[in-house]
Each structure stands twice: as structure tokens, then as C-alpha cells.
């Protein structure tokens, strides 16, 4: 509400979202980023897009070199979505550490290890880099204001799994003299195999990738899409699937803009 009130009174805001570059882009990514693009087009605002290559190196069993290759590929993938090139800025954590790190240590000084442990369930076996990472993800909330000598609100559309980071960010950011960000949570897009969980590029055979051909998409849906069907083929043909868990129906909620048509399909 504060952000919208500020916007209504003539103030600008900027968008911040991101990507952990460790694999190919899939339909779940697109469902969030297409909304980000809509926001940018609708409000004509700047977008700061963070590629958290450090996060993926610290959290996943993948080499630094592999992550850099995925960073390059994912940058091309994001650019292909059609964001306004004159108002879209890419931040790569390792490449732009020179401007991110000085602010990250200011954030880190306000976050206790106890807070990180309780938020993420860390133990003594976690590497110290992963403990620090939340500070890096916090910086783009206010970095554009520092670089441009402004005091604008930040709006963050994000997947719900990123919420623990930004809960911490919101708790400490006021202590540094910056405005708390506004956050819009996006639901996980159901995986092909069922309504529980999220789409993931780690299992590309059962995930719709943005690089898949129409033939590959059709094959994956026919082979893996969960329908919540009846006990027998005959009953399924008569009664159909369970629309509350049917993956195709869940996906149509994201991509079918006509609510009337969607209701007819559900019937």
C-alpha cells in the first residue's frame, strides 16, 4: 500500500527479481518473469535482475566454471523474454562484487548467525559462504538508489522459496536507512508429475524447458502429466480427471487469460 500510495502521488519505484544460474530455464521461471515483464511494461519502471552465481556455487554440488556457463546462457534466456533493454539492468554477484560487496557487509553486520540458523536450519556442516549469502541478495533492494542518488521503493516479485531471505532483509534494511521493499509472492508452478512440489530444471525429462520443441513439449505432457484420473480407463473417459489436481488445469490458471473459457474447461 505504501508503494502504491507513493506511485499515485507521482513517485517512481523499481523492480527487483533474479535467477540462480545452475540449469536451463523452465516454464516455472517463465510464469514469474512474464508477470515481472507485465509490471515493467504497465508501470514503465526500471528492472534490476540479479544472477546469483555465488549462491548456486555455495549451495549446490556444481563447479564454478559450470555455473559461469549457465549464467551466460540464462542471461540470454532472460533477454529473450523481451524486457525493456533501456530499463533493465543485470547484476552478476561475482562480476559485480565491487559494487555489491561493500553494501553487503553493511547488511551482514546487522544479521546474527542465530537468525540465519533459525531461518534456514543451518548446522555446523554448512560452509561459511552460505551463511553470508543473504546479505548479497539483500543489496539490490537499495543499490539502485545508492547508484542513482534516489530514494525509491523497491517491488520484488518472487517465488515463495525465496521468502526466508527477504524476511530477514525487511527486518534489517530499515536499520541501514533504506525503505523496506514491497513483495509479491508467486506460487510454485506444479510439476508435470503432480500438484505437489515445484517445476525444476534438475529433472529436465519431466519439466517443460523453454528450449523444448513443440514435439518435445507434447511428448512430455502425454507421458508424464498427472491428471488425477479415475480408477479405470472407462471411468476416466466418463468422468474426466480431477481438476483440483490435474496438471493441465493447474497450468491453464497461469496461461489462459479468459476466465470464462477457463471455467468452461473446468466444467
Feature locations, PLM:
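Short hydrophobic beta-strand segments
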Residues: 14-17, 156
Amino acid at each position: 500500500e505504501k508503494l502504491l500510495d507513493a506511485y499515485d502521488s507521482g513517485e517512481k519505484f523499481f523492480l527487483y527479481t533474479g535467477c540462480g544460474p545452475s540449469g536451463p530455464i523452465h516454464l516455472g521461471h517463465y510464469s514469474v518473469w512474464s508477470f515481472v515483464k507485465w509490471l515493467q511494461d504497465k508501470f514503465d519502471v526500471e528492472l534490476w535482475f540479479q544472477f546469483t552465481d555465488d549462491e548456486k556455487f555455495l549451495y549446490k554440488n556444481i563447479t564454478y566454471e559450470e555455473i559461469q556457463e549457465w549464467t551466460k546462457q540464462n542471461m540470454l534466456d532472460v533477454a529473450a523474454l523481451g524486457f525493456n533493454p533501456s530499463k533493465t539492468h543485470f547484476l552478476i554477484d561475482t562480476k559485480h562484487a565491487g559494487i555489491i560487496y561493500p553494501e553487503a557487509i553493511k547488511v551482514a553486520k546487522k544479521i546474527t548467525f542465530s537468525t540465519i540458523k533459525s531461518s534456514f536450519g543451518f548446522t555446523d556442516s554448512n560452509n561459511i559462504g552460505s551463511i553470508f549469502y543473504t546479505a548479497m541478495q539483500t543489496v539490490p533492494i537499495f543499490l539502485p538508489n545508492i547508484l542513482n542518488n534516489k530514494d525509491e521503493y523497491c517491488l520484488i516479485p518472487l517465488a515463495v522459496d525465496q521468502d526466508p531471505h527477504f524476511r530477514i532483509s525487511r527486518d534489517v534494511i530499515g536499520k541501514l536507512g533504506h525503505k523496506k521493499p514491497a513483495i509479491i509472492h508467486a506460487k510454485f508452478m506444479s510439476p508435470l508429475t503432480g500438484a505437489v512440489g515445484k517445476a525444476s530444471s534438475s529433472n529436465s525429462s519431466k519439466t517443460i524447458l523453454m528450449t523444448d520443441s513443440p514435439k518435445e513439449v507434447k511428448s512430455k505432457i502425454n507421458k508424464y502429466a498427472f491428471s488425477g484420473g479415475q480408477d479405470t480407463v472407462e471411468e476416466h473417459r466418463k468422468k474426466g480427471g480431477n481438476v483440483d489436481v490435474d496438471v493441465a488445469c493447474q497450468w491453464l490458471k497461469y496461461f489462459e487469460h479468459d476466465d470464462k473459457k477457463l471455467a468452461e474447461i473446468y466444467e
